[in-house]
Amino acid sequence: MSSIQNKTDVILIGAGIMSATLGSLLKELKPEWEIKVFEKLANAGEESSNEWNNAGTGHAALCELNYTAEKSDGTIDISKAVKINEQFQISRQFWAYLVSQNLISNPQDFIMPIPHMSLVQGEDNVAYLKKRFKALSNIPLFEGMEFSNDPEKLKEWIPLVMEGRTSNEPIAATKIDSGTDVNFGALTRMLFEHLKEQNVEVHYKHSVKDIKRTSDGSWSVKVQEIESGTIEYHTANFVFIGGGGGSLPLLQKTGIPESKNIGGFPVSGLFMVCNNPEVVEQHHAKVYGKAKVGAPPMSVPHLDTRYIDNKKSLLFGPFAGFSPKFLKTGSNFDLIGSVKPYNVFTMLAAGAKEMSLTKYLIQQVMLSKEKRMAELREFMPNAKSEDWDIVVAGQRVQVIKDTEAGGKGTLQFGTEVVSSADGSIAALLGASPGASTAVHVMLEVLEKCFPHHMLEWQPKIKEMIPSYGVSLAENRELFQEIHQSTAEALGLSEKELVHS
């Protein structure tokens, strides 16, 4: 096995939406920098970013009830929903910029307008949804949202969901037309085509084996060319680890202090996909329910219209599964291999704390198809087993860390950037809301890792993302202006526009 040595400015590990976004930002901000990407699979966007491996929801907290918790005094905390919506607006602005500059084209291949709806049953849940609707109605980001507890109105909105419903239990929904379905796999592939045109070297079938700091403070990345077995060493002043579930083991190899006391717990996802085109045509919305009491946030059930390969699809889920792999293409030894002397107590503490999650996962793994159909029928009473197939979605590695609020071994359900003190290396860990907030998260990487460049870069960032540094929730006119311009650039329908 021969060994090859190379030097570059930036190395991105993993050809998913995060590396694609960071690479695209850097090429606009520092076009002269040399960037190399290493991906162990044969194409971009094949793991978590792949359209079959995530829900494809443009997460803007329009319908996801886990972002609007009810406080002990009965009021609704909307702060998380506002934050996530603001972050999605940043993604929309950057995508619209790329389209307007002809850096990517055919936005309809990756983003489509689709109503986002929340659906609840039972008196308490209906009261909660009404309070949530009132709280969000005062915020520009959620303008255009409608609430109804009238079954006749709901039949107009979601005929499949209402058909065959015999219960007299109260039912209510909210609907907002400014929701989107995003094909993150298609977007990732587009961005990598754009990066190749910008002279970024993208190396597929290259597996990163080790990351070590050199004597001059840069990073040496050991890469194996999978087919030939050739070992290469590439050095760079900045390395980003965006390998989805594979990021934690690579972060551990760096040895940076920030990588200690962090663990990961893999959760796999299953969806049911409708194989009957007549049924698919009768539904046109992403309808999110409420997680059952005691179930984790990632278990929120939803019945989704999706656009995949320019074809309308209908999916229901997620159902959780368990695999010790950190990636769909990973190893059964990933989980045990990630347990180190410096994080073993963090992992054990999480195991003791999260017995309810363990119980939930065991129950989910044991579900038969008919039991899954029973859950679907809570949403869609007339669903027929023969119309639905099971699809295995992606692996997600939930972060486990020690926190002040939660103590040792606290399970985190968000997305987290871990970077070295000097900003020379950063990794992205975690899951939801993930890809929808990719641009915000990669700007966070830039702020953490290139603070000395931010003043110089600010005008260009503002050109690409006009709301950068400004709260759209507090600036109605700016939000309406940006929402309209991004809708036009991205080819979203007139219905999607927010009107004053």
UniProtKB/Swiss-Prot annotation:
Highest taxon in the source lineage: Bacteria
EC class: oxidoreductase
Pathway: Carbohydrate metabolism; tricarboxylic acid cycle; oxaloacetate from (S)-malate (quinone route): step 1/1
SUPFAM superfamilies: FAD/NAD(P)-binding domain
A GO molecular-function annotation: L-malate dehydrogenase (quinone) activity
Pfam families xref list: Mqo
Cofactor(s) recorded in Swiss-Prot or TrEMBL: FAD
InterPro entries assigned to the protein according to its UniProt record, in alphabetical order: FAD/NAD-bd_sf (IPR036188), MQO (IPR006231)
Keyword field: FAD, Flavoprotein, Oxidoreductase, Tricarboxylic acid cycle
Reactions it catalyzes: (S)-malate + a quinone = a quinol + oxaloacetate
The protein's Enzyme Commission number: 1.1.5.4
Keyword Methyltransferase listed: no
GO biological process, one term: tricarboxylic acid cycle
Record has Transport as a keyword: no
Family (UniProt): Belongs to the MQO family.
Protein name: Probable malate:quinone oxidoreductase
Organism: Halalkalibacterium halodurans (strain ATCC BAA-125 / DSM 18197 / FERM 7344 / JCM 9153 / C-125) (Bacillus halodurans)
Organism taxonomic ancestry: Bacteria, Bacillati, Bacillota, Bacilli, Bacillales
